[in-house]
Amino acid sequence: PNGLPMQYRGVTSPFGMRTHPISGVMRMHHGIDLRASEGTPVFATAEGFVQFAGGSGSGYGILVILSHNYGFETRYGHLSSAVVTPGSWVKKGDLIGYSGNTGYSTGPHLHYEIRFLGQSVDPANFMGWNAQNFKNISTLEPNVSWQ
């Protein structure tokens, strides 16, 4: 996965340890929170299989989970709605939903998460990854076995 999942107006919470804005408990934040108006289109950052789409029953609210090649998975949380269905295939850039304020959320945003073999990695490293800086990702993200 690479590139931006949506147009956004800033990062409200980066990847890493933080004090949770609702519970007040210090814990790992496994993604990046991107501020956006409710209803902003959200796009797949890589082609893949829709593993889950709908109400998560957890802090994610309405959630889309995509499974990608090479052990990658992306999660898109707090959506106002999902427009994909489990079992379908999406291409990079396909519309998958709209940003929202569902689940444990303090305002409209997208929680964007990338996992490699089940382990969370910093999405910011992948959001700026492109053909011009292709080799940089292997040094920026040491938690992925690139060979």
How should these model regions be labeled?
Residues 34, 63-64, 91-103:
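Short hydrophobic beta/alpha edge segments that flank linear recognition/processing sites
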Residues 12, 35, 67, 77-80, ...:
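Residue-level detector of conserved, well-ordered beta-strand and adjacent loop positions
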Residues 46, 54, 94, 99-100, ...:
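Conserved "cap/hinge" positions at secondary-structure junctions
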Residues 27-29, 44-83, 108-109:
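Zn2+-dependent peptidoglycan hydrolase active-site motif and core
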Residues 35, 85-94, 113-147:
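Acidic, glycine-rich catalytic/binding loops that coordinate metals and/or anionic ligands
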Residues 32, 40, 74, 82, ...:
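Glycine-centered loop/turn positions within well-structured domains
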Residues 1-60, 92, 142-147:
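Surface-exposed, glycine-biased beta-strand/turn segments
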Residues 14, 53-54, 82, 99-102:
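Residue-level recognition of beta-strand microenvironments
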